């Protein structure tokens, strides 16, 4: 399945408490269960006003379904085309 990066604009995200982040993670886990086998939440990176979420999913539609179930915004969805890291300099380019 393809891997995606989802951008979510959520003002004041950086000020969320650990308890709030835990609650959001539970909501996301529940939404994944409801959306079905075609989606997996990998991880999310929280910045001051945005979230960057990594998902493996059959397509963008199920990502939007997950967001609707959980009440999360979806400002952009980008399919990952390749992975580049320090080892890539030696010719080891990874593709999902």
Q: What residue ranges belong to the model's regions?
A:
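Acidic-residue sensor for enzyme active/binding pockets
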Residues: 7, 43, 79
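Short S/T/G/P-rich N-terminal loop/turn motif that feeds into the first structured element of a domain
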Residues: 1-34, 40, 48-50, 85-96
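A short linear hydrophobic-aromatic micro-motif
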Residues: 37-43, 76
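Amphipathic, hydrophobic secondary-structure cores in small proteins
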Residues: 43-52, 63
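An amphipathic, aromatic/His-enriched active-site/gating alpha helix that lines ligand/cofactor pockets
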Residues: 56-83
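Acidic/polar N-terminal loop/beta-strand segments that form early-domain functional surfaces
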Residues: 9, 44, 56
